[in-house]
């Protein structure tokens, strides 16, 4: 694979990333329901933050964020293992799945880290109209050989991954800026419980509904990323692993353009600096 893209997070933080790179992947079955994969990636990332944001005379973001600017090369190897015993990968009504992925950066290049993510879910259908599911995911990334975790290698959660919160709406935040720039986190754990319920609409309308509750946490920066230029702890960088939670209703519509999802959410637990939302519209793979 060869690719080039720009990841623009300036609506939620102070930076954007330009990336060019490539990689090779190999996947193979272990059993009827289990697969494994291996990969190698080589890429060049350039983190851009406007110079005016980092002017010492009028800085609007923290020094630790400004220090993330620059270009660097990442060379990593990784693998994944997945067991899937659901009766349908798109709209399951029974069964379970679990997956593990790890990436080791530092096989050459400029950065060194180990990133691990796990996920899983279980599904049980009481009837065609009532289907209960419980899913969860967790991740941790940490530098090695003296490296900290750069801002674009951290985890960001919210939006589709945590309903009730904006994209990058939870996690560590830099309050030096009026907006409160998202800084992500080295660790996260998120769970979701969902119950599909009948809508009592004719099937040809293509509408389904579900009640849900999402809950979890995200945070944990390196200590070096919480300091001022003088080396003191910056009180305007907030970072904790407190519980966040939300509940609401999702509507799935099989539209002529493809599956669409509408989420109506109410936040039940949050920090004052989190960014929340009550409605989200998105495309969906599920129906």
Provide a role label for each language-model segment:
Residues 131, 216-247:
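Outer-membrane beta-barrel transmembrane domain signature
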Residues 1-88, 92-97, 163-164, 170-175, ...:
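Gram-negative/organellar outer-membrane beta-barrel architecture
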Residues 20, 75-77, 96, 116, ...:
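Hydrophobic core residues within well-ordered beta-strands of beta-rich domains
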Residues 31-36, 87-96, 109-111, 126-132, ...:
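Short loop/turn motifs that connect adjacent beta-strands in outer-membrane beta-barrel proteins
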Residues 2-6, 38-44, 96-104, 118, ...:
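Transmembrane beta-barrel strands of outer-membrane/channel proteins
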Residues 22-28, 77-83, 118-122, 136-138, ...:
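Residues on the lipid-exposed face of transmembrane beta-strands in outer-membrane beta-barrel proteins
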